[in-house]
Amino acid sequence: MHISPDDKRLQYCGRIDFDDPKAPVLVYAASFVQICFTGTEISVTLANKRAYWSSRMGYILDGKQGQFLLTSDPGAETYVIARDLEHTEHTLTLFKRMDSCHIVTLLGFELGSDAKVLTPAPLPSRKIEVFGDSVSCGEVSEAVDYAGKPDPEHDGEYSNSWYSYAWMTARNLHAQLHDTSQGGIALLDKTGWFMAPDYLGIESCYDKIKYQPELSEVKPWDFSRYTPNVVILAFGQNDNHPEDYMAEDYNSACSENWRQHYRRFLEHLMELYPKATFILTTTILEHNENWDISIEEVCKTVNSPRVHHFLYSQNGKGTPGHIRIPEAEQMSKELTAFIESLGEEIWDCLLYTSDA
């Protein structure tokens, strides 16, 4: 039994390209599609386009997590997720483990002939959006033997958005998540690590559904499709490449320019999301504290009750490598507590659209 991607009984979450409803494209980490069904087997047909690293999709089937390797060929491929299941109700959440190192098109699910698709529970009414970098994507998170250490050599196999502090926090708070994050990215173009050697920054990518020019035509995002209650700005670490001007001179022209651009970006998002609460932060990945001091300065300058600066207990000094699962759990615990301390009123859903 073929289940088309535009079947109304499928449930989606994330910044996903639905221009072709029969072939939606998952771009961002933590984007997912969920299907509830009765039956004994399920497969999925996907078309993968890869820029770098090996591509892997993740899934949660009846509470148990798994993954599978995607082919590097651009054509459609059918992947068996499970066979010989008990003939009862099942829930599958198929999610994007990685950022735009690849994009994947969903072409449908295949169930047994005697299967039945069920209507899933509604998504949470609470909504979070994270604008961040590789840490927010869960990059190299599964390399748990390297907690507090530099990264091991890898080909993307340790990256898993499920274990990002961002998705952990959303689950803690029973909220939807748009993880609008990209590994290696900085705020400004020509800085950071994403799309070397020219380097694309958040300013060029934040308003796109497709922003990886090696994989597809660049395409704008319609912000009316998702209105978050809480917005987390979690960047300012890759910005020290190729030059850590903030560490060298806090008052330099480059440093002041960064603060001005950060403020303009924040104020633009505040206009797009006029009722949202904003949390400005970085992570425990090692970086010079002047980046966080700059963010604090912007927060004070904006001087809005909707804007908060948050520092983790190990902010900027926790690890020289990416954040592993135990470290992400601690970050999530601290961030969850901070968001909860802001009160229930930040989740007043009457102020927001109902679109997922």
Identify the residue ranges that each predicted region occupies.
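Active-site segments of SGNH/GDSL-like serine hydrolases
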Residues: 232-239, 262-297
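Glycan-recognition and processing domains
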Residues: 1-27
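Serine-esterase "nucleophile elbow" of acetyl-processing enzymes
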Residues: 56, 90, 113-192
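Conserved SGNH/GDSL esterase-like catalytic core that processes O-acyl groups on lipids
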Residues: 28-30, 151-251, 285-292, 322, ...
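Extracellular serine-dependent O-acyl
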Residues: 277-348
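Conserved small/polar residues in nucleotide/adenosyl-binding loops
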Residues: 352-356
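Short, well-structured beta-strand segments within conserved domains
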Residues: 42, 76-104
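Short, surface-exposed beta-strand/strand-loop-strand elements in extracellular ectodomains
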Residues: 54-64
